[in-house]
Every structure is written in structure tokens, then in C-alpha cells.
Amino acid sequence: MGINIRDFDWSRISHIAEHGIEDYEVEYVILFDKEFVLRGRNETYCVFGVTENGRYLFVVLAIKNGDVAKIITARDMTKKERQYYSSRR
């Protein structure tokens, strides 16, 4: 599933930072390693990806105005999610 992103809405950056995730890591996963994207609930997308440093992230986002990604949350993948992600690649 392809999602085209022009810009990011970081209004929840403090929440994301609580998970120890940096904005550049989220951007990398969404822009460069977005081959595994699932449709979530309430018009959201779940993106599974690996940062350029090998960190496995799970990102939830919503698309606003057609091409702006509002990052709702981001965290490290659980062990089970990593296994699922690896089996689907």
C-alpha cells in the first residue's frame, strides 16, 4: 500500500519522545522503509519499518489534507511484531 507524504505534523512529538523515538527515525521509516503498511482503525495507517541504524519501529499516522502525515505515535516494535515484520518482507 503506497502512501505519499509531502510534509509531517509533529504536534504529538512530546508523546513520541516519551518512547525514546527521534523525529528523524520516524521520517526515515515512513519515507524510505515503508514497504509494510497496514490500514488501521479510524483512517490511520500502521507502518512497520527499520531505521538506517537498524532500529525496528512501529508508527501510527493519519493522513491530513491529502499528503500530510500526522504522526500519532511511534515506538519500538515488540518481539512478536518484529517476527511478523520479518516474515512478511
Pin down the residues of each PLM region.
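Ribonuclease/tRNase effector modules and their secretory precursors
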Residues: 1-89
